[in-house]
Amino acid sequence: MYRGRYFKDATFHSLSIIEPVVEKHGLTMAETALRWCVHHSGLKIKDGNDGIIIGVSSYTQLEANLRDFEKGPLPQDVVDALDEAWMVCKATAPNYWMKSLEYTYDTEEALFGGRN
């Protein structure tokens, strides 16, 4: 199921763009992803109410993730590589939902309390 979603030429090409730049700075892919979410995405982590839910399989992994959250923005060449990689793979990137998503409730009411 996941092989069909992610094992695509564009995905591997994107990784070949990202990995050398990440390695040049001594970063891990996980650290790069977390720091991008905190500092370079549209999320408002520091001055807003957005958050990131992480899953871990060990205490060591939790410590590493929390440490990475506290680090600053990524070097510009890493951000540039991520942007370039996204341009390569976005046309074939899978949708988050594997099946069609149908809400069984009024989403506007749930999100905004029915205000106009």
Sequence positions of predicted segments:
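Intrinsic disorder/low-complexity segments
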Residues: 38, 89, 93, 107-109
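Glycine-rich, positively charged active-site loop/lid region within alpha/beta enzyme cores that binds
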Residues: 1-21, 47, 95-116
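Extended hydrophobic/aromatic segments used for targeting, binding, or gating
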Residues: 59-62, 66-98
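Conserved short secondary-structure transition element at the edge of the structured enzyme core
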Residues: 4-71
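Polar/charged alpha-helical tracts
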Residues: 24, 76-80, 109-110
